[in-house]
UniProtKB/Swiss-Prot annotation:
Pfam families reported for this sequence: Rib_5-P_isom_A
NCBIfam families assigned to the protein according to its UniProt record, in alphabetical order: PRK00702.1, rpiA
Protein encoded by which gene: RKI1
Species lineage: Eukaryota, Fungi, Dikarya, Ascomycota, Saccharomycotina
GO MF, any single term: ribose-5-phosphate isomerase activity
Keywords carried by this UniProt record: Cytoplasm, Isomerase
Signal peptide: none
Recorded metabolic or biological pathway in which this protein acts: Carbohydrate degradation; pentose phosphate pathway; D-ribose 5-phosphate from D-ribulose 5-phosphate (non-oxidative stage): step 1/1
Protein name stated in the entry: Ribose-5-phosphate isomerase
């Protein structure tokens, strides 16, 4: 018999995956336009189930799907969907993506998966942007409460030292150049061949202002603060219940 802590961990993991699937399915069922032509599919563990649900649609060959990175490209292909590119289809009917954190005003922190620029590009091109997550990603108030790893910021590689200093001057408690971990020696390199910085500003009461201040720094490509972009967020909990938050 497995030790108690192992069995509990597996039960928790199973419950969380069930929550993600329920939220993803409801988000697609409630929002997918019947005559959509271009659909954005983001990155992350919850979006796996979004792509799964979209792949079950009877008219799935009537639209193209735009990816936000390598993972979502594979999800599109694996679910028998038609892959397109944002260069070909700059106007997106609807986009689905996950989030690292969602505040009470439906602002987001994204970028934990290192795809923030492409994710923001697709989301900003969409007529409707839908967020799907489990309840762990829901902040009780501001951003920076549930997600404690900092704001992901994509930067041009040779600017990271200068940007690091300037982020500290803006009030960041810590600024870390994200590393590749055991699979890669050295920093994470994005799909755009840039570096990622994680800057911890603590609780963020005005994400719009912080985003603008960071974007003004020379070398910053994009921030993981998604402000006033999401239309609706769906959160699944381990019981299978799905809650909805709209702007």
């Amino acid at each position: 018999m497995l030790p108690t802590f192992v069995r509990f961990s597996r039960i928790m993991s199973s419950g969380i995956e069930h929550a993600k699937r329920m939220a993803a399915y409801k988000a697609v069922d409630a929002n997918f336009p019947p005559h959509a032509k271009v659909v954005g599919i983001g990155s992350g563990s919850t979006v796996v189930y979004v792509a799964e649900r979209i792949g079950q649609l009877k008219n799935k060959h009537d639209f193209v799907c735009i990816s936000t990175g390598f993972q979502s490209k594979q999800l599109i292909i694996d679910n028998g969907l038609t892959l397109g590119a944002i260069e070909q289809f700059p106007k997106v009917d609807i986009a689905f993506d996950g989030a690292d954190e969602v505040d009470t005003n439906l602002n987001l922190i994204k970028g934990g998966g290192a795809c923030l620029f492409q994710e923001k590009l697709v989301a900003s091109s969409a007529d409707k942007f839908i967020v799907v997550a489990d309840t762990r990603k829901k902040s009780p108030s501001d951003l920076g409460i549930a997600w404690r790893k900092g704001v992901p910021i994509e930067v041009v590689p040779n600017s990271y030292a200068v940007v690091t200093r300037q982020l500290k001057e803006l009030g960041a408690k810590s600024v870390v150049l994200r590393q590749g971990g055991g699979a890669k020696a050295g920093p994470v390199v994005t799909d755009n061949n840039n570096f990622l910085i994680d800057a911890d500003f603590g609780s963020i009461s005005d994400p719009g202002s912080l985003h603008q201040q960071i974007k003004l720094l020379v070398g910053v490509v994009e921030t993981g603060l998604f402000v006033d972009m999401a239309h609706t967020a769906y959160f699944g909990d381990e019981s299978g219940e799905v809650s909805e938050q709209s702007r």
